[in-house]
Amino acid sequence: MGIGVIDIDNHECMTLGSIQTSDCKTLDNMGKNLVDWYSNYLISRKDELQSIFRTVVADAFFSKETFITPMCESDFHVISRFRNDVVLYYPTLEKKTGKPGHPKWFDGRIDFANLDLTRCKEYEVNKGKLYGLRVYAKVLKRYVSLAVWYPMDGRTGKWQLYFSTDD
């Protein structure tokens, strides 16, 4: 596992350190899986890392509740990517009525082939369309900020879903 610091303005990355990932047998003996091991390692270095940054960027492998929740509880923010088949919901637009019971939590599942553009903010980007919105991610059991990118390179039905736990 490698930890690096990214300088976005200069398009550079500097390595802070690395550690050999434990093998499956060792992880099993510890009662952990790979996702648990990575989150525990980052959290164990929390004070050192948070003196430099609070945002962790991880690949789609880590877009799991068992990684995201411990990281957020340790005051880290996470940016990652969802798989294209992820289940996401629009937050409800209903207001409280004063009647007994809780209003519904969601207005429906998001269909990325037919995205409701009235709920999105569009951003100008090269070679595609980018939309931002707030969604509920079933896999993470939390609300996240979502960026949906539709590339304009001839690929139909191929969108990319990036999320952030930071509001």
How would you name each of these model-derived features?
Residues 9-12, 153-157:
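Short, solvent-exposed loop/turn segments that connect beta-strands within catalytic domains
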Residues 1-15, 75, 129-134:
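Active-site-proximal, Lys/Arg-enriched surface segment
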Residues 155-167:
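Extended, non-catalytic structural segments that build the interaction scaffolds
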Residues 16, 146-147, 162-164:
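Active-site-proximal beta-strand elements of phosphoester/diester hydrolases
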Residues 20-149, 154:
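An internal, acidic/charged active-site-proximal segment
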